[in-house]
Amino acid sequence: MKITFLGHAAFLVEEEGLKFLFDPFLTGNPQAKIRPDEITADYILVSHGHGDHLGDTVAIAQRSGATVIGVFELCNFLSRQNVKTHPMHIGGRYNFGQFTVKLTPAWHGSSFGEGPVEYLGNPCGFLLSVGGKTLYHTGDTGLFYDMKLLAEIDPVDILLVPIGGNFTMDVKDALKALELVKPKYAIPMHYNTWPVIAADVGEFQDKGRALGVAIKVLNPGEMVVL
């Protein structure tokens, strides 16, 4: 599985000849090293409607013909903008043929716009199972104990986990998430984009490895094959 970190919570995952794009916030992202018109995808998985996650979804989906996977309300919003969608809801699992997706809970919010905002359903995370591996992108979330249950049902190979605090888990809570999920690998996200989510990634790396998890810290634009 080839994973490219695009900055913040955005990732491009490639496996089985398919491209999965998570939370493609590129325009306005101080960490991004790539423009929206330089990327294509078969599927875009959007965890919630905040601008730093919904990001460039519409432009990329319209240009590439990608199908957006997310909660029902978010997909309804995107369908009105001529975007192909596959609506789901938390706890739902769907077999797309070459891969399966399960939506997981996330403790956060989800709305779009300034001034009067549009409610876009509950935030979520994703369990993507493809090519014999399962990747868990938690979305923006605080720590919750049912992460353990999720991983008991679908053992996780790769965990993409926020560590920046303030809006999500911080390093301390993300380390507890490692104990609950017990992934083989973990990649930190959602940190150091702005000062309010500054985090010591070295601490997460050292303490995570002490728990027996292979921690892969990626710079924006960097890729790893797992």
UniProtKB/Swiss-Prot annotation:
UniProt-recorded Gene Ontology molecular function terms: hydrolase activity
Keywords noted in UniProt: Hydrolase
InterPro entries, sorted: Metallo-B-lactamas, RibonucZ/Hydroxyglut_hydro, UPF0173, UPF0173_UPF0282_UlaG_hydrolase
SMART domains, per the entry: Lactamase_B (SM00849)
Residue runs in coiled coils: none
Record-stated family: Belongs to the UPF0173 family.
Protein name stated in the entry: UPF0173 metal-dependent hydrolase CHY_0920
